[in-house]
């Protein structure tokens, strides 16, 4: 595994930002400002986003704010979609979005590659009431040298996971019969996950593809043959705009 100085610097900057925002959140909790924002975050996107900035990489904070980690425009589209049907949901990449979806759907299956994060999410799911059945699965990556590869699309392109194979993870959606109304792609090996997801999408269903402005993801989305609605803009807990895309079958 190579050590890219740019990736190292990026991770350090992100860690520094997270630590700073958590320090600010701790300080605000000692004042009336945090309570003031908390009472107003339901009044509009601006208040909600300001409140969420203190919940960066904080699953409990995002659960309390009742948001997934997508752009607000995408959240609105998916929320409206879930109100139209008792949706069967599959998710790549568990987190606050798992509970958000479980509050609005008939069933949620979520696959996670990281054992520690899986345990944290499972604890939160088990502590919830008024959610649908959630099937949380662990599918860790394999070392690429130990797996016969038919397609490099299953190899992680993330710097700190280079050389790991996510075939089992991406294929988890194929272990159950039937199709899914909503498929969320917000984890590892997203191009491979999209390939599997496109074959399991219900008629009239949608795929949520997060962080879709990244070049390698744009290419995979373009080649998927699906209709694309790009939703750029503010994202809960992020200080900069991002993009989430909604993919649907052509009608």
What are the roles of these predicted feature ranges?
Residues 68, 87, 91, 183-187:
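Short, charged/polar micro-motifs that form catalytic or ligand-binding hotspots
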Residues 1-66:
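Membrane-proximal basic amphipathic "stem/tether" segments
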Residues 173-177, 182, 187-251:
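C-terminal substrate-binding/active-site "lid" region of AdoMet-derived donor-dependent transferases
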Residues 75-78, 95-97, 167-173, 192-196, ...:
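A generic local structural motif
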Residues 122-177:
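S-adenosyl-L-methionine
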Residues 72-146:
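SAM cofactor-binding core of SAM-dependent methyltransferases
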Residues 45-85, 154-162, 167:
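Class I SAM-dependent methyltransferase Rossmann-like catalytic core
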């Amino acid at each position: 595994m190579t050590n890219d100085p740019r990736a190292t610097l990026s991770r350090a900057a992100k860690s520094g930002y997270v630590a700073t925002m958590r320090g600010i959140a701790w300080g605000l909790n000692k004042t009336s400002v945090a309570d003031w924002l908390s009472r107003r975050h339901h009044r509009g996107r601006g208040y909600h986003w300001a409140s969420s900035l203190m919940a960066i990489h904080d699953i409990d904070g995002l659960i309390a704010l009742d948001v997934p980690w997508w752009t607000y425009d995408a959240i609105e589209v998916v929320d409206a979609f879930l109100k139209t049907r008792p949706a069967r949901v599959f998710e790549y990449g568990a987190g606050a979005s798992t509970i958000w979806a479980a509050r609005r759907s008939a069933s949620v299956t979520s696959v996670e590659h990281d054992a520690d994060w899986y345990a944290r999410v499972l604890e939160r799911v088990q502590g919830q009431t008024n959610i649908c059945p959630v099937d949380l699965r662990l599918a860790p990556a394999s070392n690429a040298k130990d797996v016969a590869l038919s397609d490099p699309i299953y190899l992680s392109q993330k710097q700190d996971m280079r050389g790991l194979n996510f075939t089992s993870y991406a294929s988890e959606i194929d272990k159950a019969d039937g199709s899914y109304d909503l498929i969320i792609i917000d984890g590892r090996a997203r191009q491979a996950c999209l390939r599997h997801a496109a074959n399991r999408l219900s008629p009239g269903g949608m795929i949520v593809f997060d962080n879709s402005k990244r070049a390698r993801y744009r290419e995979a989305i373009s080649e998927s043959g699906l209709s694309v609605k790009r939703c750029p803009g503010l994202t809960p807990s992020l200080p900069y705009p991002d993009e989430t895309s909604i993919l649907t079958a052509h009608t």
